[in-house]
Curated annotation (Swiss-Prot):
There is a cross-link at residue 37 (Glycyl lysine isopeptide (Lys-Gly) (interchain with G-Cter in SUMO2)). Residues 163-227 are annotated as: Interaction with MLLT10. It comes from Homo sapiens. Changing residue 74 to A: Impaired binding to histone H3 diacetylated at 'Lys-14' and 'Lys-27' (H3K14ac and H3K27ac), and subsequent deposition of histone H2AZ1/H2A.Z into specific chromatin regions. This is YEATS domain-containing protein 4. It holds the Pfam family YEATS. Component of numerous complexes with chromatin remodeling and histone acetyltransferase activity. Component of the NuA4 histone acetyltransferase complex which contains the catalytic subunit KAT5/TIP60 and the subunits EP400, TRRAP/PAF400, BRD8/SMAP, EPC1, DMAP1/DNMAP1, RUVBL1/TIP49, RUVBL2, ING3, actin, ACTL6A/BAF53A, MORF4L1/MRG15, MORF4L2/MRGX, MRGBP, YEATS4/GAS41, VPS72/YL1 and MEAF6. The NuA4 complex interacts with MYC and the adenovirus E1A protein. Residues 15-158 form the YEATS domain. The lineage of its organism: Eukaryota, Metazoa, Chordata, Craniata, Vertebrata. GO terms for biological process: chromatin remodeling; mitotic cell cycle; positive regulation of DNA-templated transcription; positive regulation of double-strand break repair via homologous recombination; regulation of apoptotic process; regulation of cell cycle; regulation of DNA-templated transcription; regulation of double-strand break repair. Residues 178-226 form a coiled coil.
Amino acid sequence: MFKRMAEFGPDSGGRVKGVTIVKPIVYGNVARYFGKKREEDGHTHQWTVYVKPYRNEDMSAYVKKIQFKLHESYGNPLRVVTKPPYEITETGWGEFEIIIKIFFIDPNERPVTLYHLLKLFQSDTNAMLGKKTVVSEFYDEMIFQDPTAMMQQLLTTSRQLTLGAYKHETEFAELEVKTREKLEAAKKKTSFEIAELKERLKASRETINCLKNEIRKLEEDDQAKDI
């Protein structure tokens, strides 16, 4: 049964034990080089920093606001966005850390803090020449363990963000497959190296035992000669 926010009370309806809800998100930035320094301020790039849901859903169902803390050199460095898209677009010339804080509609749910290093440059020549957008984005998960009754309702009643195709700059599913393949290959390589080392160790032990037997035999021969 759907309840209005005021009906939950000051404790947001209390904690719902044994419930875990995971909300995957994507955060990061895109940047494009102007091609040269801008005469009026020396800025070289336009960039956008953002937080968005990994799945196609409207986060405003449970997110009250998202705060972006920019470098102090920007006017009004503390930017607040209260509805999707949760993003800030600016221009600049340098990279710096952006502190992102996600606040929830439920006042009893603690905010989530993310740290993102704004990326403007990369070694790719095409990107440096402005032919390609620089992308630096990451997958993360907000895990709500024993949420309040209010938060549980908010988290499970969100709607789709868009009716059209929904995708990210990075193909995370493809990246996950590639990462798993790399881990599997590394695991196989490590197993092979361990097996190889065990064989070497076994051969070394056999060599040592042979040498010990030869030494013992020589000692026994010397003792026999003395007699």
